[in-house]
């Protein structure tokens, strides 16, 4: 995952890149935990580049817009995704569950239980209840 500082243009995330920071998402990190890390790095990248932006002394890197995708907020209906019937303990299922864990807005309901954390260990999904 990562954060990118871009020069704003008329598109969505289509402007040239000023700077970026990449980081590894750990196997058991929830969407909400990842969001908080993204916010931390967003602040860091902004502070790092603030003075050079004010002075107009920064380099721009054009991006290949053919490699990008955009999904609008309305393209995902979370209410249809959060009720999960867990039948198999797979990494794919674990990733799906943890992608929906965002306590300010929703928690996935797995086999009837609100889940605040999913841990994948020894090919098993361990669910922590709300």
Q: What do these predicted regions represent?
A:
Residues 1-71:
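Donor/substrate-binding cores of folate-linked one-carbon enzymes
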